[in-house]
């Protein structure tokens, strides 16, 4: 899931309410039977090999993981038949706070996953819907100062990430977790402006090919404003505190350009070009 990668990038760089909610986590949901819990646990392990292999190495193994698994029934397609929110716990499925979240629906063959790339504190079912299924909101801890809110919409087969936002916990200020840069037709550069802090950076995505040359020029009234360029495999390409950088791109894919500052909000202007 792209937001997970972006969260990792922002944390690396730091080291170098919500409308339309209908059903908060845990409210209006039913506890499934022991048989359903067992079937869902087996299905999760069958679907996610890395998780299964990790759990097998943990103290207590699969039995402890199943006991600690959270399963709640909900009806996201309003047909009177339950779907199930499954949240694993422990080091194999969780970071410091956020844990992997899955949603399964019943089929003639058993259970199939319709959401398998979410991580957070739980699922909220929204009033809005897509293709007959309620939209979902997953809230996650991002940093000590911010939380992440990711909206998922059903595309007819699976829930897909539709929007990701970071929110400052104290001020309520919010911004997109990332924005995609696009050049105007016939041009090879663009200029963006914004206001950032260490808690609320700006993250841009720019698709490029290996061998192209990227140039980034940053202008800001405060020296604390800085930028970082990360390759598609999250390799840092820029020296600390650089205000200008030119480099030949090593990979084909989406490059991440992150701008942040210190605790104070700071304005900036940045020009990016690719040749």
Language model segments and positions:
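Acidic, small-residue rich beta-repeat scaffolds with periodic aromatic anchors
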Residues: 5-8, 12, 21-53, 125-177, ...
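Extracellular beta-rich ligand/substrate-recognition surface
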Residues: 58-66, 191-200, 237-238
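Short consensus segments that form the blades of beta-propeller domains
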Residues: 61-62, 90-96, 141-143, 217-218
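Acidic/hydrophobic-patterned starts of short beta strands in beta-sheet-rich repeat architectures
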Residues: 77-89, 130-140
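Short beta-strand-plus-loop segments that form exposed binding edges in beta-rich domains
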Residues: 140-143, 258-264
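Non-catalytic extracellular/lumenal accessory regions of secreted precursors
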Residues: 173-205, 211, 275
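Acidic, Ser/Thr/Pro-rich low-complexity intrinsically disordered segments
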Residues: 196-260
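Edge beta-strands of jelly-roll/beta-sandwich modules across compartments, strongly enriched
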Residues: 202, 263-275
């Amino acid at each position: 899931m792209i937001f997970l990668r972006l969260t990792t990038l922002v944390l690396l760089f730091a080291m170098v309410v919500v409308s339309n909610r209908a059903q908060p986590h845990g409210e209006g949901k039913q506890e499934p039977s022991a048989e359903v819990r067992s079937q869902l646990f087996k299905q999760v392990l069958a679907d996610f090999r890395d998780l299964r292999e990790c759990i097998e190495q943990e103290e207590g193994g699969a039995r402890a993981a199943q006991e600690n698994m959270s399963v709640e029934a909900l009806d996201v397609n309003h047909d009177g038949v339950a779907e199930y929110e499954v949240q694993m716990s422990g080091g194999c499925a969780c970071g410091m706070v956020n844990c992997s979240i899955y949603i399964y629906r019943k089929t003639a063959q058993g259970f199939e996953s319709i959401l398998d790339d979410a991580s957070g504190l739980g699922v909220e079912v929204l009033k809005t819907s897509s293709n007959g299924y309620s939209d979902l909101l997953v809230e996650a801890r991002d940093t000590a100062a911010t939380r992440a809110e990711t909206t998922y919409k059903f595309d007819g087969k699976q829930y897909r990430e539709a929007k990701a936002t970071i929110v400052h916990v104290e001020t309520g200020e919010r911004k997109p977790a990332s924005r995609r840069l696009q050049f105007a037709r016939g041009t090879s550069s663009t200029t963006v402006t914004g206001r950032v802090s260490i808690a609320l950076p700006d993250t841009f995505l720019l698709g490029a090919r290996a061998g192209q040359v990227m140039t980034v020029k940053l202008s800001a009234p405060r020296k604390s404003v800085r930028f970082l360029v990360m390759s598609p495999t999250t390799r840092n390409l820029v020296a600390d505190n650089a205000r200008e950088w030119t480099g030949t791109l090593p990979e084909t894919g989406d490059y991440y350009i992150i701008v942040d500052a210190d605790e104070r909000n700071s304005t900036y202007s940045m020009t990016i070009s690719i040749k």
